[in-house]
Amino acid sequence: MAVKFTESFRKGNIFTKLSILIPGLGNLVGKQIIKGIMYIAIEAAFVCFMIMNGINCLAMLPGLGSRPQQEVWNEKLGIYEYVAGDNSLLILLYGIATIFIIIAYIIVAASAVKSSYKLELLKEKGKHINTFAEDVKSLFNENLHKMLLTLPVSGVLIFTILPLIFMISMAFTNYSKVDSHLVLFDWVGLENFKQIFDSGSMIGQSFWSVFGWTIVWAVFATFLNYIFGILVALLINRKGTKFKAFWRFIFILSIAIPQFVSLLIVRSMLAQDGIVNVVLKNAGWITKSLPFFTNATWARITVIVVNLWIGIPYTILQVTGILQNIPMELYEAADVDGANGFVKFIKITMPYMLFVTAPYLITTFTANINNFNIVYLLTKGDPVMAGATAGKTDLLVTWLYKMTIDYQYYNLGAVIGIMTFIFLAIGSLLVYRRTKAYKDEEGFQ
């Protein structure tokens, strides 16, 4: 029997209404002793937490602390002792965690009201009222989904939602090494967002430069891998190709090698004194080393080309089965009409592939926006202009890493993370809703 909180509170008896203040009261009155005691125990734990820590955490959240660490002279020992001050980071974390606990308690209190009202209705209708043992048994039968989802949902809230809110809140503080705000920091409102969007500041210029390159990189990395992957898969699948399993194995072999190992090897090979430049010099083809990582244009092209070697095998895996499922009648009809291979590829193969793999393309584009490994392990964002925090090959995700780990601009790093999330979330949803895979799930014509 499903009931709503508003209905339960409005139509319930006095004990049901009081359950919002004393969770479990209605259950105790209705003879559900164990359930009532459990609700009261949860309330007691909540009250103890709020008295001992929660109220203080909430009270300090608006100011984020003000007492700095101090040196105090100990006359007895004849030395200076350090007295710990406030830690704004912990105050922020504990304050947000307290808000989560309060919300969780409100949900429990609302559940107690609904439970009491449900018990009231069952009594009025003369229906069977479950004992505690029967309620527990129902968790393995009709309410199995509730038991199975409890742990995963709790994990998402604690390890995903809570850190996400914590990170977002940092964007509204001055938490950075600037003016020594790494221990004590304050709320600054939208100042960090203004700094990021100000094209006249060094940070603002870096943001728009990195953002533009990130989009260019994601487009090339996604569609070049996709198109070349389809072409290679077509070559392997065509009737005249021998040893198809062998060729697939060769391409898939690169996936088996840990990516960070292969990228570091490629970085070493393409270095100024790497094997590629040495071989080309010895062959007399060049007189000075090619600037694979020291010239911005060369570095960007290098990253895109190396990504082809990494990404094409994944595309081959993805599209091989789909290519084999394209109806042969379409190709036979095209042969009757006198279409050549190129026309069949443009008019049949690509439209069918785009119809089926549009969601895959969107997720791949999103993954490339956040592709940390290839850029950081291959170029580390280089080359970097003097005084700049971002390099010419930095993506938003690698720049965010540098801003937080290398430069300790945690507030600006949080802003970059928020902007990346907003762009990806809105962009992905809008594009997905416009695809034929979403609009027409029935089939391909």
Give short role names for the model-derived ranges.
Residues A2-T16, L21-V29, I33-M50, Y80-F172, ...:
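N-terminal signal-anchor/first transmembrane alpha helix
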Residues K76-A84, N130-L139, I196-I203, K288-F293:
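Short membrane-interface loop/juxtamembrane segments of multi-pass integral membrane proteins
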Residues C57-G95:
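Membrane-interfacial interhelical loops
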Residues K31, I42, N53-Q69, F100:
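Transmembrane-helix bundle segments that line or gate the permeation/cavity pathway
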Residues N53-G63, V113, L144-Q445:
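A structural signal for multi-pass alpha-helical bundles of membrane permease subunits
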